[in-house]
Amino acid sequence: MSNEVETSATNGQPDQQAAPKAPSKKEKKKGPEKTDEYLLARFKGDGVKYKAKLIGIDDVPDARGDKMSQDSMMKLKGMAAAGRSQGQHKQRIWVNISLSGIKIIDEKTGVIEHEHPVNKISFIARDVTDNRAFGYVCGGEGQHQFFAIKTGQQAEPLVVDLKDLFQVIYNVKKKEEEKKKIEEASKAVENGSEALMILDDQTNKLKSGVDQMDLFGDMSTPPDLNSPTESKDILLVDLNSEIDTNQNSLRENPFLTNGITSCSLPRPTPQASFLPENAFSANLNFFPTPNPDPFRDDPFTQPDQSTPSSFDSLKSPDQKKENSSSSSTPLSNGPLNGDVDYFGQQFDQISNRTGKQEAQAGPWPFSSSQTQPAVRTQNGVSEREQNGFSVKSSPNPFVGSPPKGLSIQNGVKQDLESSVQSSPHDSIAIIPPPQSTKPGRGRRTAKSSANDLLASDIFAPPVSEPSGQASPTGQPTALQPNPLDLFKTSAPAPVGPLVGLGGVTVTLPQAGPWNTASLVFNQSPSMAPGAMMGGQPSGFSQPVIFGTSPAVSGWNQPSPFAASTPPPVPVVWGPSASVAPNAWSTTSPLGNPFQSNIFPAPAVSTQPPSMHSSLLVTPPQPPPRAGPPKDISSDAFTALDPLGDKEIKDVKEMFKDFQLRQPPAVPARKGEQTSSGTLSAFASYFNSKVGIPQENADHDDFDANQLLNKINEPPKPAPRQVSLPVTKSTDNAFENPFFKDSFGSSQASVASSQPVSSEMYRDPFGNPFA
């Protein structure tokens, strides 16, 4: 079956092939006369009939194939042999070959069993082991069938007729196409239709040629015209690889900003394609101009000092000199890839220019331009531009900065280094990632100093307070805009926050102390120590502490909050809402980072937390916003002064410690973020039924709490409808119910309903007295 019918390019080959065959009478008479006209006349009408038997029909997967046809023939012959052993006989048929195709007609009934047009016949195979058998494959795409036929005489004449049939059809079609082409050429061509028609003609020729050469080739398969699609795929792959390369350079750039970055190297002027106005023109071009240094973005190769980089063409001679001089300066953190850092710094400059308006809209009312001089680096690029958004963030009054005239190595000011180190704070702030010149690129440099959490201002000698203040938490602050600059003022000596800002007071809008848009303070007193603590408002209860101050104008009790160095500022709880510098030094969750130089340690023990809670209870509060876990401040109390208020501890404190162990940690953590209405319900519930959550504990705890509750219970007020903030529970960490009576019955009655509920939420941090 591997012997396919040879195709004839000329009409003379069939005559040469017919001579050595066992000639039939028909071929002897008509063989020499085979022309297109003769063949057309031969196959017109009913065409030629051959007597045969149908061996069988088998479904095949492909349109053509010698091995496939041979397997099907063997299978069908085996089935026919099995049927013959059972007395069955093959169906006697007539094979009719005409211009319409092949028809299989039942010999007895004359019914057309199968009819296959020429364009549905895809393959013909002769059985080389049986000269009376042949088969052909027909059917549409996915529906191919192999018909095995056993002729009454030699199968060769039938196969030759099939070959002649396809040859004449091909020749007729070819003549028609040529005639059509001549007619089209004589006509006037409009709108380029001639090219399309010629293309169609060539396609048809290819189809016909394929069919003729392969003998019943699949005419449904068009020629391969998919090369443009492949080229598009290649272009897309190249573009993606270019984007990935640039992203890798940015991804590696943050590791070069360790304290001493390559800020000492001069920044070249940004390329034109990196400017914001050209950001989406040159970079999105599928055919970018060739890069003189294609490996400049490789973050793992050291820059070759002898060969000029691709950025040298953009530098002025002065900048090149500065580059040669400053590149010889040894860096403490090893060799840095200057070009990669340039790439990142260009991106920072774009980010700074495009997002400057967003940076100015930060919550701090003071711009750093008022307190810090605009420092120019060696290459003339402003420090603010090199730092990205960090300089545009508002200053923090609690950290001093070097004087204006102080010069720092490499001509870069201190806050440049500190801003690079504290970049995790400045990126996660209010400013979203800027629009990048490359798709998928974020401000990756912001995440550089995950290992530098306590390293802000470490390299700044003039800073007047310990470096622990720079990064108070082990987590990147999530909500403060650029806390790096929040830690700096222009005053070199430790002073009060408002004094360090030149005595400017922050006035809070009287009608809207609760602006739920921001979790820290939305234009509220920015000088609170808790605000400096960077994006963890829940740990400090800041929205409760300072947001209520306009409504508590009647509580003019600045004495417990002015335990040390009261600056000349308005009253703490006055309507102006300016806060004393050390008002909440005890609520720091990190071991009081502000204790040195600004807040003396005695402020921790001299102000009992009950004073804060009693002042916060009375005014109506809107429900607090859900935020990070609000139980950090209780842990901070423990870290600051685990033995604080020991002179007023009593039996209630000791039994309270036993109760702290019982509630599971997870429910307590969820309970922290419940609404204030739920906490108020807890307060009223535990005011009358103390110890019920401790049913699984010892009955001694239950009785002791009931006894202490009866001792401590003042005249019960009506259940408070006022929304008590969730952060109230964190301030009650060390409340003493007996000590609160000194403030009067009204305060004691409200505050006494809180100890049990506050203890319910202190459990996740353990008990320092257990």
Swiss-Prot record:
SUPFAM superfamilies in alphabetical order: PH domain-like
Motif segment (DPF 2): 298-300
Stretches with biased composition (Polar residues): 1-16, 302-313, 366-396, 407-425, 466-480, 604-616
Composition bias, Low complexity: 745-758
Name of the protein this chain belongs to: Disabled homolog 2
Functional description taken from the UniProt entry: Adapter protein that functions as a clathrin-associated sorting protein (CLASP) required for clathrin-mediated endocytosis of selected cargo proteins. Can bind and assemble clathrin, and binds simultaneously to phosphatidylinositol 4,5-bisphosphate (PtdIns(4,5)P2) and cargos containing non-phosphorylated NPXY internalization motifs, such as the LDL receptor, to recruit them to clathrin-coated pits. Can function in clathrin-mediated endocytosis independently of the AP-2 complex.
One MF term in the entry's GO annotations: SMAD binding
Pfam families tied to this protein: DAB2_SBM, PID
Domain (PID) ranges: 45-196
Cellular localization per UniProt: Cytoplasm; Cytoplasmic vesicle, Clathrin-coated vesicle membrane; Membrane, Clathrin-coated pit
PTM annotation: Phosphorylated. Phosphorylation during mitosis is leading to membrane displacement.
Modified residues annotated as Phosphotyrosine in this record: Y170
Modified residue annotations for N-acetylserine: S2
